[in-house]
Amino acid sequence: MASNRCAVCKILNETCAPMCIYAPHFPSNDASFKVIIQIFGAVNVCNILDNLEFPEQREIAANCLRYAAEARIRNPISGCHDMILQYKNILNNVEQDIESAVNELGTYVGHDQVPKFYDLPMPDDFLMTPVSLDSFIAKIKSLNEVQKNQLMQLPTAADNAPMIMNSIFGKMEDKNLKDGHRADGASTSAGK
């Protein structure tokens, strides 16, 4: 029975009940729990997990404690805070790049013609599905030099942009459909 105890019960030298709330999050072979109790203390970890009502909340808390403890070991002075500052800095740089690109595009097509980020059609799961971005990148990579040059020419008005994109990508898809394959390389023959 002693070998089946979870990491928390081993540290606290208690018997591990069959429905122990710590066992799913800190199994007996979990080496990260030693780091967690080194930083937060076993009693504090138990109090945090005991005060949570649902197993999903305990799982999130256990992962957060694990992440924060590892960050504190790597950087004893600032821990997670330093990583948060780094990510905020990256986000600020990206926002500045976007603002710069919008301003530059505005000089070519007019500031009133530049679409706002909330106006752009984008599915809710766009960032979660790599297929949407990968297929677009594959299309761009498969362009010939003439098509790339056409794509790189900025339109004089925002109304011309869809026409240019359709002319480039539409022609490429038509070509790919003639040889029995879509732009992403999949067969259009449906097993015929």
From Swiss-Prot:
<dbReference type="InterPro" id="IPR004883">
    <property type="entry name" value="LOB"/>
</dbReference>
<dbReference type="Pfam" id="PF03195">
    <property type="entry name" value="LOB"/>
</dbReference>
<feature type="domain" description="LOB">
    <location>
        <begin position="4"/>
        <end position="105"/>
    </location>
</feature>
<protein>
    <recommendedName>
        <fullName>LOB domain-containing protein 32</fullName>
    </recommendedName>
</protein>
<comment type="similarity">
    <text>Belongs to the LOB domain-containing protein family.</text>
</comment>
